[in-house]
Swiss-Prot record:
Protein name: Putative membrane protein ORF6
Membrane topology listed for this record: Multi-pass membrane protein
Record keywords: Membrane, Transmembrane, Transmembrane helix
Higher taxonomy: Viruses, Duplodnaviria, Heunggongvirae, Peploviricota, Herviviricetes
Residues passing through the membrane, by range: 4-20, 37-53
Compartments, as annotated in UniProt: Membrane
Keyword Kinase carried by entry: no
Gene: ORF6
Cellular component, GO annotation: membrane
Amino acid sequence: MNSLTIIFLLSGLTAYHAVLADGTGSSESVTAGDSGVVVLVMIGALLTLLMTIPIIGLFGIYVRTRASIEEMRGILMQIHLRLITGDQRSNRGDVELGAGASLLTISSQPPSYAEALLMEPVEPQQQEGVPLEAEIRV
């Protein structure tokens, strides 16, 4: 017998008579029609539970992907507007863009990912124990 049959025997939901440990049979039994309904309800509940988990997971992936696409679209639109207007300031507004930005041409197409990386200013990193002014000698 499988575990589902054992559960039904113990719960009294099948038409089988449960045999007790002392060998006597129990007088309690339920018709087979009732057990069929119970089985269908249990299978339906199990399938519903199993289907909600992947649906919730897929919805979460969709929401995260959608947010990432919208964020990237906003960043590309800012870069595109900067190219059109000739604005060469970074997001902080006071740092001029590096020499790589002057190589870009103004076009009606949004810049590629590589061009967008060229537009970001690279700030010098201070090495431990060395003053920043000593590193930037020109």
